[in-house]
């Protein structure tokens, strides 16, 4: 091997680990969010509302089970907790369909829906792995007018859940 070629190979071998470490990693932690009616993170992804990191990761609002925040306790997505941000409000009937778009399916214990801190719907999947789209019929009962719905996807085999807030006008 010529001296110049040996030098080039050595330089290449020395730089390869540096280049590999500096390249952005592909997201292996994609999961899911409410796509319809549009959740706050769906509105961010669509550009309906100006947002930060959540614009590129609407499926990534994950946090410990039992939280009540739209951001799932994730400071990177804190704008989802801001009720004054100008979120679009979607008119829905008293018995509305909520659609989750899942980019990675996890064994699921339950799906929960809350309004004003009160659970209004619970769907038990018993550890089943869902498909790429999951629809739930949620009955708002006597609630009407503008409401903020907190939807929670509780993963069966971890201590985490996925969170989404949806601004709706029930009966509107």
Swiss-Prot record:
Q: Which keywords describe this protein according to UniProt?
A: Carbohydrate metabolism, Chitin degradation, Chitin-binding, Copper, Metal-binding, Oxidoreductase, Polysaccharide degradation, Secreted, Signal
**Molecular function via GO:** chitin binding; copper ion binding; monooxygenase activity
**How far does the signal peptide extend, from start to end residue?**
1-30
Cofactor(s) the record lists: Cu(2+)
Query: Which residues participate in Cu cation binding?
Result: 31, 106
Q: What is the top-level taxon of the source organism?
A: Bacteria
Question: EC number(s) for this protein?
Answer: 1.14.99.53
Its recorded reaction(s) are: [(1->4)-N-acetyl-beta-D-glucosaminyl]n+m + reduced acceptor + O2 = [(1->4)-N-acetyl-beta-D-glucosaminyl]m-1-(1->4)-2-(acetylamino)-2-deoxy-D-glucono-1,5-lactone + [(1->4)-N-acetyl-beta-D-glucosaminyl]n + acceptor + H2O
Can the keyword Ubl conjugation be found in this entry's annotation? no
InterPro entries xref list: Cellulose/chitin-bd_N, GlcNAc_Chitin_IntDeg, Ig_E-set
Q: Which GO terms describe its cellular component?
A: extracellular region
Q: Name one GO biological process term.
A: polysaccharide catabolic process
> Which pathway is recorded for this entry?
Glycan degradation; chitin degradation
* Subcellular locations according to the entry: Secreted
Q: Which residue range or ranges hold the Chitin-binding type-4 domain?
A: 31-168
What task does this protein carry out?
Involved in chitin degradation. Catalyzes the oxidative cleavage of glycosidic bonds in chitin via a copper-dependent mechanism, leading to oxidized chitooligomers with degrees of polymerization of 4-6. Is not active on cellulose.
Name of the protein in question: Lytic chitin monooxygenase
